């Protein structure tokens, strides 16, 4: 696994952590945005791991 893939996965995990905190405090719309970015970062990691740009 490359450093770039690790960075994207770390960003995805951090976004999910923030989303969880937002949900717990009743901010569902804001959490949805963070979840969107978590999926984006995870997809980027997958593409990079598969050799994509």
State the predicted function of each range.
Residues 1-53:
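Terminal alpha-helical segments
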């Amino acid at each position: 696994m490359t450093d770039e893939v690790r960075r994207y996965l770390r960003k995805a995990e951090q976004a999910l952590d923030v989303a969880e905190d937002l949900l717990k405090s009743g901010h569902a719309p804001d959490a949805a945005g963070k979840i969107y970015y978590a999926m984006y970062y995870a997809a980027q990691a997958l593409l990079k791991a598969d050799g994509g740009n």
